[in-house]
Amino acid sequence: MLYYINKILSNNKVQAVILGIIGFAIVTVLTSYNIDDPSFNSVTTEYPSNLVGVFGSYLSDFLYQFFGLAAFIIPLACFVWSRNCWYGRYRGSFIRIFVMLLALISSSTLLSKIKLEFIPANAGGAVGIIASNFFERFTNQLYLLLIFFTFIILVVLLEIKFTSLSNFIIKLGKFLIYRVQSFLHNIFSQLSSVRLFPTKNNDKINITSSYQKPVSEKVKFTEEAKPVPANPIKFFSKPPAVPKISQSEIAELPPISLLRDPENHNVKGASSSELKQKAEELLTVLNDFGVKGHIININQGPVVTQYEFEPAAGTKTSRVVGLSDDIARSLSALSTRIAVIPGKNVLGIELPNKQREFFCLKELIETPEYQDKSTLLPLVLGKDLAGKPLIADLAKMPHLLVAGTTGSGKSVGINAMIVSLLYRYTPEECRFIMIDPKMLELSAYDGIPHLLTPVVTEPSKAVVALKWAVKEMENRYRMMSNIGVKNIAGYNAKILEAVKENRVIERSIQTGFDPETGKPIYETVTMNMEKLPYIVVIVDEMADLMLVAGKDIEMLIQRLAQMARAAGIHIIMATQRPSVDVITGVIKANFPSRISFKVTSKIDSRTILGEQGSEQLLGMGDMLFMGNTSKISRVHGPFVNEAEIEKITEYLKETGTPEYISAVTEQPEEDDSSIDIGDGTSDEVLYKKAVQIVRDERKSSISYIQRSLRIGYNKAANLVEKMEKEGIVSPPNHTGKREILLPER
């Protein structure tokens, strides 16, 4: 019974509720105090008027006698501690009590000179009188120090971040300076437009009756800022791609305290003698199967130990690799992975440790490798065989393909990648499009300010979202082309440089020709002076989308994977079914960086990585990572639980609100392209196209229609049967051929 009580009380949510109730009870006791109620100093036969009864009357009298009005610091501290416990921001009990006592003594001393009638002692209580008499022996100016000391204690008690306060003051000052500059600029611009004397040159305004296609564009920088036109020329008719979030609504980076601390499991690695004994057993097993050689090095990691085996001359690598199952059986190991170590004349034989070391995400985020600013989009993958942190840069990959069966740790790995980006970038710097057809894994992130749209769960909307990403990519390339840069980093650097120098970027666009002189007419357009954020598209289950709209998804992902890197758009695509109909050759060719968790067969491992080995992994975050250099590394992923993700998302939702773009998932009216998603409209469009093909090409075979429309065999057969019912083609004859009944055009 005591075990379950301790387990319940150890829950941070339960502790938060208990502290909140205690604080509310103390506030009720203090506010309903009556000097005539029974207490330590008075006796009465009447029932106390205190809302908590006799206990409340005695407790309130005790608190007012000792601390005076400073007693209200006690419930305030309870409320602050309750909030910290709820969000997992723990501090030691000694520090909590010590800070509260300092605040009580300081406040009581400051209030000791105030006399009040409704409390038994003065406003500072007995503690205030004693402390005040003690301090007055030295100097009266000590009260100034007490005021400052009380302020510091209250700031620590309320956990007000000085960095957040200073950043707010700096942002407020910049905002006020900007407003004053804009006001003065508008006044001087209006005064300059009033001409006291006529000028010699008359101003001419050329107006064209219709918009003509621009012939050439020129970019220039102006030293003086000009007001942006009300309706600037846009690259396409849709609303701006990624709206700027106001500074007041930018969500702060989540504190590291939201992640749980590393747990000390007292996992002891094998001793050197044990490793040597295991190496001798391994050599004995290899000799039994006719493989000669010797072990030259042993690398002990957190999960597996790698034995570098140098085979004898003339031994084929495939012969040793094929013995992985036999070695695991002979050594009573869960699994054995054998692979060539790049750059060495040895084979790496990886055997699992007796005790597995578990590590959390917090210890990897605190490493210098993650804090390195040269890594633009850091993804925390885990630790390698030597126990060193492995932080990959998504900007250099530039896209990532993830595969793994259920229970292999794929979802935890994706969560670790997302959290690592959330701890680096604010919503102004990085945005997400999350596609989750299973409506399970990514739903926890719904509502965070980093999202461009709510988590997409419908396959039809997923196709529209990918189309929007393609159009956004093309729009960004036009914007980068206008100022002469090649990638998003150069674009943002140029925009930032122009903003610091208080200038705007303008471009001259030729809109037509003067009908009288024949000279070109130019219009000056001010470009949008906002930095472009990174956009990360996360697709949790690719197989579901490929089953519904395979060709459309494949073409859109191919276009994004080929071109979106320079535009700052990156894709993380995951699937639990790494078969050839999901991970097609087109997708593999455009995703050089891949991660494979544990899979069921060697075929699946070859599909995702091009070689076997993933089927020998241990699961629970054990993965093989292939970077864009085609070098495969074994990595052990960190563990991040649902409670940590919930704390992070709740914090982000409280500090910022998302600004969704409806165009991401809305099918535009002018888009006539049909998507085969199984509804009646797309079937009708396909049928009309099939009839047109039969009429024009005079061919009615199912295979020909299948190739022409790029659809499945069953769909093509249904279309031909429908044409047969409507009298467009005849039934098949004894050879299977059909006669076309439609007249030729």
Swiss-Prot record:
- InterPro entries per UniProt: AAA+_ATPase, FtsK/SpoIIIE/SftA, FtsK_4TM, FtsK_alpha, FtsK_dom, Ftsk_gamma, P-loop_NTPase, WH-like_DNA-bd_sf
A GO cellular component term found in this entry reads: plasma membrane
Any GO BP annotation = chromosome segregation
UniProt-annotated binding residues for ATP: 407-412
Q: Which residues form the FtsK domain?
A: 387-606
Q: Can you tell me where the transmembrane regions are?
A: 15-35, 62-82, 92-112, 116-136, 142-162
One GO term in the molecular function aspect is: ATP binding
Which loops or segments lie on the Cytoplasmic side of the membrane, by the record? 163-745
Keyword entries, A-Z:
ATP-binding, Cell cycle, Cell division, Cell inner membrane, Cell membrane, Chromosome partition, DNA-binding, Membrane, Nucleotide-binding, Transmembrane, Transmembrane helix
How does the entry describe its membrane topology?
A: Multi-pass membrane protein
Q: Where in the cell is it found?
A: Cell inner membrane
The family assignment reads: Belongs to the FtsK/SpoIIIE/SftA family.
The subunit structure is: Homohexamer. Forms a ring that surrounds DNA.
What does the UniProt record say this protein does? Essential cell division protein that coordinates cell division and chromosome segregation. The N-terminus is involved in assembly of the cell-division machinery. The C-terminus functions as a DNA motor that moves dsDNA in an ATP-dependent manner towards the dif recombination site, which is located within the replication terminus region. Translocation stops specifically at Xer-dif sites, where FtsK interacts with the Xer recombinase, allowing activation of chromosome unlinking by recombination. FtsK orienting polar sequences (KOPS) guide the direction of DNA translocation.
Q: Which PANTHER family match?
A: DNA TRANSLOCASE FTSK (PTHR22683:SF41), SPORULATION PROTEIN RELATED (PTHR22683)
The record comments on the domains as follows:
Consists of an N-terminal domain, which is sufficient for the localization to the septal ring and is required for cell division, followed by a linker domain, and a C-terminal domain, which forms the translocation motor involved in chromosome segregation. The C-terminal domain can be further subdivided into alpha, beta and gamma subdomains. The alpha and beta subdomains multimerise to produce a hexameric ring, contain the nucleotide binding motif and form the DNA pump.
User: What protein name is recorded for this chain?
Assistant: DNA translocase FtsK
Q: What is the lineage of its organism?
A: Bacteria, Pseudomonadati, Pseudomonadota, Alphaproteobacteria, Rickettsiales
